[in-house]
Amino acid sequence: MAKVIGIDLGTTNSCLAISENGQTKVIENAEGARTTPSVIAYLDGGEILVGAPAKRQAVTNAKNTIYAAKRLIGHKFEDKEVQRDIESMPFEIIKANNGDAWVKAQGKELSPPQISAEVLRKMKEAAEAYLGEKVTEAVITVPAYFNDSQRQATKDAGRIAGLDVKRIINEPTAAALAFGMDKGDNKDRKVAVYDLGGGTFDISIIEIANLDGDKQFEVLATNGDTFLGGEDFDQRLIDYIIDEFKKEQGIDLKQDVMALQRLKEAAEKAKIELSSGQQTEINLPYITMDATGPKHLAMKITRAKFESLVEDLIARSIEPCRTALKDAGLSTGDIDDVILVGGQSRMPKVQEAVKAFFGKEPRKDVNPDEAVAVGAAIQGEVLSGGRSDVLLLDVTPLSLGIETMGGVMTKLIQKNTTIPTKASQVFSTAEDNQSAVTIHVLQGERERASANKSLGQFNLGDIAPAPRGMPQIEVTFDIDANGILHVSAKDKGTGKAANITIQGSSGLSEEEIERMVKDAEANAEEDKKLTELVASRNQAEALIHSVKKSLADYGDKLDAAEKEKIEAALKEAEEAVKGDDKTAIDAKAEALGTASQKLGEMVYAQAQAEAQAGESEQANASAKKDDDVVDADFEEVKDDKK
């Protein structure tokens, strides 16, 4: 059976793994490294360098050295994220004929799938060198929050590289697979996979269940940001260095392509060093020059300074965690393990933020650079028939539907629905003798069609003349295991059908997604606040009742000052529950809880003292009995009669 390799196609670095006979191995590339920089260089003579060799020559060939191409995949040139990247990238990003964001290098116009294919080809060659046989099939991972066109573009990249992509799987799911299969126990567990990579962020809540020796990995919910990652952290540091240098020297390094490339390398190195040290120094001699001569850059960066520069980026990663937990119907206390994936998750401040949110230390036994590729390789072995003890149940990240009469979106598939899935619904015409209908496919959470993301549209014609509402048009949405959407429409009267596979549409920005969800939830927010207020009030009243009872039973055992303190806290809590301020109720209940805790300790101490007194009486009674017992003296007698 042909081997199906697992590839983590990352924004900054990529990784390759193979699973055979239940054993998974990360494969080194031609340079002997376990990860490959996702950097591609186009040279004058037509030669293409990939990985470390491309990265090494980037300073002298900045305009033709492409990195972070994954950030452009499936995006339109006009997208604001692409426009933001244009300002900071040393290479040229152009608008393709179809409106997509492409790259220009050595005079050639290149699509992001084309560029990514070079990295995949290098992975393929490394696998073939290791196995000693031809490799044609692969499982490739993508961010969980990638949309249909981004997934399709990733499959296209595989095809360009000569690979039949058997499955596209989500990066957090792959990491959970690697983690779950590595655990020898059969314990059911819920894990949160926090995946902060080079260019994208995902959070997935996954349940790992043991089913008669087999393991089922079910994604309960997923969320994320396709434009948040280590590249953004690097950029914050680069911008800071540029600003400081401009203040000192009056020269803007943004205008110098070669200086930008040197700054990028220095910033990435400094960021990594600050994960283990408290301070690092950036030294870039001859960074630029003016009429007075060459200029040198020397700057000390502390960990605290770097953390302050990226504080908001870290905070941006926490909100999707909150949403994913809510969508999964869980609280932080329900999570058994927190797994960190992606190189940027090594940053201590990131780990602190994750620990603070989930209330538990993230696992340190998962390799953040390799776990995703390992999971992809395990899925590859499953697909090749090499193992059958694993079942993956992934989800679609956003709701999908069509525009119907009145400009509303009718959802056929809800967000976080397990895939593959299929849903059909019968619609009809809006006017008498209508001969054609336009099926407008949408993605999002809003009721109003125009407020959602348009994924594409197609027409179904030759509908037999009939009064409005009579024709029966069945629309079917089919999402395959790769998360790619296929839509079809069929006139049940004539059997006429039309269909579309969603591809080539631009990606969704995090802001668009957040706005869709927030707008849809706006009405539900007030109800939620009321429910939370009632819950807080009930908890506070239960505590008030409990403390009052304890005071009545044990108040005489407290000193006056302690009793007065508790009574004051009681009075404040009773006043708070009369109002509608949830924060005040919670605060006063907490204060009362602290005061009543001391009361509880005294009650416990009193009960313990009484118990000890009882034991002491028993001991005395026992000793009195012992006074009546006569101790016998024994003498050793030697028996000589043998």
Curated annotation (Swiss-Prot):
In-chain residues carrying the UniProt-annotated modification Phosphothreonine: T200
Q: Has UniProt tagged this entry with the keyword Nucleotide-binding?
A: yes
Q: Please list the GO terms describing molecular function.
A: ATP binding; ATP-dependent protein folding chaperone; unfolded protein binding
> Which SUPFAM superfamilies does the entry link to?
Actin-like ATPase domain (SSF53067), Heat shock protein 70kD (HSP70), C-terminal subdomain (SSF100934), Heat shock protein 70kD (HSP70), peptide-binding domain (SSF100920)
Report the family membership. Belongs to the heat shock protein 70 family.
**InterPro entries per the UniProt record, alphabetical:** ATPase_NBD, Chaperone_DnaK, Heat_shock_70_CS, HSP70_C_sf, HSP70_peptide-bd_sf, Hsp_70_fam
Instruction: Explain the induction of this protein.
Output: By stress conditions e.g. heat shock.
State the organism named in the record: Neisseria meningitidis serogroup C (strain 053442)
Q: What does this protein do?
A: Acts as a chaperone.
Where composition is biased (Acidic residues), the residues are 628-642
| Protein name per Swiss-Prot or TrEMBL | Chaperone protein DnaK
Quote the biased-composition stretches of kind Low complexity, using this chain's numbering: 608-622
Q: Which PANTHER family match?
A: HEAT SHOCK PROTEIN 70KDA
- Annotated region (Disordered) at 608-642
